[in-house]
Each structure stands twice: as C-alpha cells, then as structure tokens.
Amino acid sequence: MLPIITKTKRRARAANLSQFFLMGLLFSTLVSRFPALKELYGLSIAELGFIPFAMSAGSLIATPICVFLSAKYGSRKVGMFCYLQTLSLCLFVLMPEKYMLFGVAVLYGALMELSDIAMNANSIIVEQAYKRPILGMFHSFFYFGMALGAVISIVTMQIGLSVTVHYVVMSVVAFIWFAINHVYYLKETPAKSAANQKFKILLP
C-alpha cells in the first residue's frame, strides 16, 4: 500500500494533467466552431475577428486580479473560477443579440485567465512536491486536449451537430470534469505578507 503522501502527490499530478488537457479541449472547442458562430449570428468577418480580441482584453484586465487573488487565497480557491468558465462557454450560443457576444468574450477571457493562472500555480506546487521538473509534461497535455477538441469539432461538423448543442454539451461535461479535478488540487498556505496585501496594479 502506497504512503498517503505519495497517493496525494500522484492524484494531484493526475488532476493537473487532466486539467491542462481540459483547458486545451475547451479552447479548441471554442475557436474551432467560430465559423458556425459567424453563421448563427450573421457576423461579418470583422465582427468575428473582434471576438478573440475581446477575449484577449478580458484576459489582460483579469491578469493583475488573478495574481493578487492567487497570492492572497491560494491557487486551489482561485481555481474555482473554472466552474464559471466551463458554464460561460454555452453563453456564446445563447445570446439574443450578436453584440452581446463581445461582452461574453470579455467575460470568458477573464475567467479563462483566472483558471489558467490558478492551474499553473497549482502545477508548480505539484512540481515542488515531486522535487523534479514536470511542468513541461503538464503543458504538453494542453496541446493533446486541443488536438482532441479539434477532432471532436470535425466530427460534430461532419454529422451536422449544431454549435449550440456542441457548446452546451461541452459546458456540462467540462463542469463535471473540473469538479473531479478540483478535488485533488493541492492546498497551499498563502504567505502572511500576501494575506495582508492590498490590491494594486503594478506598472512596468
């Protein structure tokens, strides 16, 4: 029987590998169906191109908040924003007006950034627990997830599955998937200096 500490580390590593895979799967699912979103809402090429721009803006806005929250509360707690990210995927196909998509894109970008930083921070804790470099393995699983997401999207397009059904089903699956992953995230105790730190934006 393996020692408890070894089981904990292995489960945390598996959970982080699974989480990187899931994040790649979600990202690939979203962008690979952009042509279907264009058709669903009657977007122009310029309007479609503004969606990834809005996502980037959301990520940029959220970055200093992510760093502050991770330092103050720890990556495991901040990682819970991924619940909202998984659910927000389906918002892309449920908006009554196309211009509301851009607000959804900003929100999704911000939530994706929060989830991503928390995931990376927790993977560093796992690497420290293993006392050997394993971050590269985590990041490789992101691209495996992207590859699977692309394959699934190709299949859904070939069988004529609507982007609405695709996104809603993926949102539900991803929500459950993350709930399982999050159970095995390693906990960390934030430093006292970080716990008492007030939010501020640091300029270069």
Model-derived features with residue positions:
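Pair of pore-lining "gating" transmembrane helices in MFS-fold secondary transporters
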Residues: I5-P35, E39, V106-A110, K200-P204
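Juxtamembrane helix-start elements in MFS-like secondary transporters
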Residues: N16, F34, K38, L43-P52, ...
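Short hydrophobic/small-residue motifs within alpha-helical transmembrane segments
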Residues: M55-A57, Y143-L148
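Helix-to-loop junctions at the C-terminal end of transmembrane segments
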Residues: I61-G74, M157
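Structural signature of the two symmetry-related core transmembrane helices
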Residues: K77-L91
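Helix-loop junctions at membrane interfaces in 12-TM secondary transporters
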Residues: V93-A105
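Cytoplasmic helix-loop-helix junction between adjacent transmembrane helices
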Residues: V106-S140
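Symmetry-related core transmembrane helices of the 12-TM Major Facilitator Superfamily/SLC fold
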Residues: T164-V183
